[in-house]
């Protein structure tokens, strides 16, 4: 199975283990073949069966190489007409399977009904959307009609009437023809290619099911067939055919360390197919016991008597082992009756030699009692168990609330960890339930809001009673560690993630129908609370009091706006106005205002805050909380009015990762311009600033803090700066920022104004005097620099220019001499114009004198106010917006279209080829230069239909795609910030109608 996402395991590339100790040899299949003989006869007599693809009589004559080649060629040419390439999306995370887009293989097993056989890990246990492509490149939608609860097979259905240009042929299933030494071909979509034909020979037919690892789907309680065919991702679901064109097995998985492949036998698959064809329920029984095939020598060590061994060897002379209980689930039908290590002798009087016999008996006796004879430590026991319904312990619904998804713990997961099949399983640890950013799956929710959650229905009822924005206690644990229960508090988000839905599987339509459970309860009224503030433990009293000016700022982003991850972020903040509630904080934590912001005082009380200001280049933001809610002795600190210099002696006060305050004396070692590396996908980063470096070992352990004088005057901030993303990890740089870079904005806010910043939209760097001479800077300007510069001898140069439509603008390589007649000696001389204004800040014209290509040039450069994102559209699982500032900074020529800043893991956008950084310029040949036009066009596109899109890559390469809409799982919506209330309002579109949330 070829996966488009790098963090998803490929089924055929997973490391496997046999599940047995020692070498297993062949198990005689004579009884199995006779057991399926009646089923095959029933299948042959069924009126809808297509004639099998049979091309030669098996008369045991020896074929020459050329005859063998021609015969295989004839067979394959017919088989490929039944094989389809499956393009699918598993829409939602479910049972440890991530949401994904992928490709696999299937083959037609009933041409009249339009039934395709493939793997269960392709169909998936959760919502599925897909289509198939036939050999002649005809395309047809498919829906899932069955996925086995345990074994790795499932069925998809298509409408044969939609296939107009080819005659559909079905492959006949012949499980009895899978024999050791048989030459086979695996015909499928190997490694994402439309058609690959891989050759091999069957080497084993009695292998235990392979194990693919923890927290993923694993088959069990069945034999597997082994061969060496070197299949890889994408071949999942391929037919394994013999030279006569019969399907003898189903490709399922493979080893990463060898060319070994694993095929699922067709015996139980054939039985399920017949049930579907005859419109009968596919009953599946279980006593919740996992069996493994163990060789006789190991069975003897576990207590098998010589008499029973002799009987088994005589009855099954080719067998070398019996089934032994590996796992018995607590509270299951077999619990306290069967023990691990018990050897299975018979069921209902039938001597057992294979998994398929066990499956057959259990499937035929759901709800009935069966009698098992086992041997335990040399003693024979007879136990009676009531067969349970396997479908009843397989989740068929899930709940979506607070941005996370939940369902009942499945038999699949419970079996692997030997747990009772009960509990609320968190299949997507996100939103309010983002317990651990490193581990998204495998959590069990034991209680919430101090109420036990033994099952999904109880969980739903509890969640109905919890108001929006409330903080509640959750008890939970991970499947891999039953001995470590965990307790945390979470913030209930029912305003950004307002959906509270229950999705239920519908095997008739193939869609998971949903119903809305409950509307959000309004948030509880906030009450003022008190907090005691403990001074910083230092001898300097003025510095110690600064604990009354420090707090913690945390944010929860609603969506990955501006290509910034929607993570929960936290850092320290400086209270710059205790009376009005203003807090200065790193923009790493407050990248935009489409989020919830919280201020924590003294690690004692939390109050909500709003985003008041975002600096476009200097990496700081200002948020505001309601001071009436805080009854604590907070102090507005004294802020410095002079810039720091190299050699200044300071006090460093930092916050560790555990929010502990640490202090240290330090010295300013360097003040220089920095260039933070840009990310592959453009997003906010600090530019055009001079960073402070200090001589302090403690600072490397702190993610934030402040720099002060001995009298408590705040001289600077110690901030995290977001850099590039490498190997799915965010690179964060720690540097100091002079408080003088923030003073103008702070003063305007304190005086009741609204600060606005207008900047010269270009990137600047520094060069040495030597480089300036080489670039043609005249000697008189060099002498002037040497005379007037008090800090560092350098010239400022243009390193990049943002996109602009102005004819007169700076160019890369320009050396800046002066601005408005003032010599430019450092980056601070190029700071933007800061003022208080209502509406759009008018542009200012600045007189630049630069050296360009060795000549002095005078330029009038217009400043611009950076517009933060205040609107975006969600379409086909992608987030579309006007190109944000980071995009304009990175591009010279910006296409006229809506910009894709993000695409979902399982979305149509990903499946059909829209990437982050793409511009959608046309939809159905209509130009879409802005969001209004785009919305107008896409609202006319019906559900489940194709539209043509023309796009432009980040490198201005045009291309076109077709995209199929799916409004059931991926509706179109618009989120827009109200200019008066500054609240974000969501509108969801259904056809030409819309609903506001």
Curated annotation (Swiss-Prot):
Outcome reported for the amino acid change (mutating residue 457 to G): In strain: YJM269 and YJM270
Effect of residue 942 to F: In strain: YJM627
GO MF terms, alphabetically ordered: serine-type endopeptidase activity; serine-type peptidase activity
Domain PDZ positions: 300-378, 779-854
Coiled coil: none
Effect of residue 241 to L: In strain: YJM269 and YJM270
Main EC class the enzyme belongs to: hydrolase
Documented effect of changing residue 235 to C: Impairs BIR1 degradation and death-promoting activity
Catalytic residues (UniProt): 121 (charge relay system), 152 (charge relay system), 235 (charge relay system)
Any one GO cellular component localisation term in the record: nucleus
EC number from the UniProt entry: 3.4.21.-
Note: Present with 3150 molecules/cell in log phase SD medium.
Function: Nuclear serine protease which mediates apoptosis through proteolysis of the apoptotic inhibitor BIR1.
Family: Belongs to the peptidase S1C family.
The protein, known as: Pro-apoptotic serine protease NMA111
Source organism: Saccharomyces cerevisiae (strain ATCC 204508 / S288c) (Baker's yeast)
